[in-house]
Amino acid sequence: MSFKFLRSTSNVLECQVVLLDNSHFSTTFDKKTVQGRDLFDRVCEKAQVPPNHQQYFGLQYIDREDGEVVWLNLDKEIRSSRKTKALLYQFAVKVFPQDPIKLEKDVQILILCQLKTLINLGKFSLPVNKHALIDGFYVQAMLGDFNAKRHKPGYLEDLLGLFYCPPTGINSDGNISEEEYEVMVKDLHKSHRGMTREEAVSASLGICKELENYGASMHYGGIDSHGVEVVFCVSIHGIRVYQLKNKFPEAGTLCHNFHWRDIISMFCDNAKFYMYVAEGRDEQNVTCRAFRFHKSLYGYKASQRLLVDAENHQKFFFEDNLERAKTMRSLSLEAKSMKKIRSGMAGRVNLSLRRATIT
């Protein structure tokens, strides 16, 4: 008997990915070294994401140590300590575009699927009427024109599955019964007769992009220099810092609003997160803002996650503001060279930097 066609499975890496439409994609790699980029490229091909839009997306997985969601580093090797089980990932929007309607139609649908999931999970709290407006356009996009023969009572949940979720206490600030809400959405669906799939998707995104926390990712567990618990809100505009409203994770009073054009440099040191921020238009005064995460075993992981998320978002601002990027890089190098951070303390450090000269 010849064994030349038999191969060892010890080097076979299996990955299972949940796509944005909740379908599953499985793929295997039969080589010793697999980069995150290798998996991401296959997923983008499956999801039909064109190369010029792939920067908006990423792959998430659950950190086995602290149970939090982490972005897969595409430039590093995928390592697995499990020899027989597949690695599990979620394809997700990493950075929301400022105007998703300008993207290609297939990518718009992916963005909308992500937003619908976030709304249903309670990441946004919407008035009932706005909730219904989004759903009305979404139903038109997914199911086409209303048809009384096919769209019987209960059709929204039956045909849309997890993407249909009536307002609840976690995703809406209003009260309405499921039956009343279904009638509300059905009437809106009827009113959209003749609207194409592309038009309905764009209309739904047009509402979503005006939401207060559109494109924002929240990071909890931070503490400022006064010992106050804070929440970090990272978006394509910058980093907002809120006081924690209550023990149930919720943003309260706005403490700071740092725009990307003013954030010179960011880094973390164990559980501490630092930002060099330019104060005033002349940029001669730079302040170091320091925060720390809870003194738990995994505080350093929370700090790293915030840094990765912030850098992903700031990159988009710099791509659209090249001259500003040059200025910030010059100031960043100058700030780092001064090494004025007070090690082990959270708070403010005032630095005085000369104005950067761009050549």
Please report, for each region that a protein language model flagged, where it lies by residue.
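Eukaryotic intrinsically disordered and solvent-exposed regulatory patches
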Residues: 1-4, 12-13, 26-27, 43-47, ...
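Detector for glycine-centered tight turns/loop "hinges" at secondary-structure junctions
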Residues: 22-24, 66-67, 246
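Short amphipathic, charge-patterned alpha-helical segments
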Residues: 32-50, 310
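Short loop-to-beta-strand transition segments
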Residues: 46-66, 130-135, 273-278
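FERM/ERM/4.1 membrane-cytoskeleton interface domain
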Residues: 61-63, 71-242, 328-331, 351-356
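Eukaryotic low-complexity, acidic/Ser/Thr/Pro-rich regulatory regions of large signaling scaffolds
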Residues: 100, 223-229, 235-359
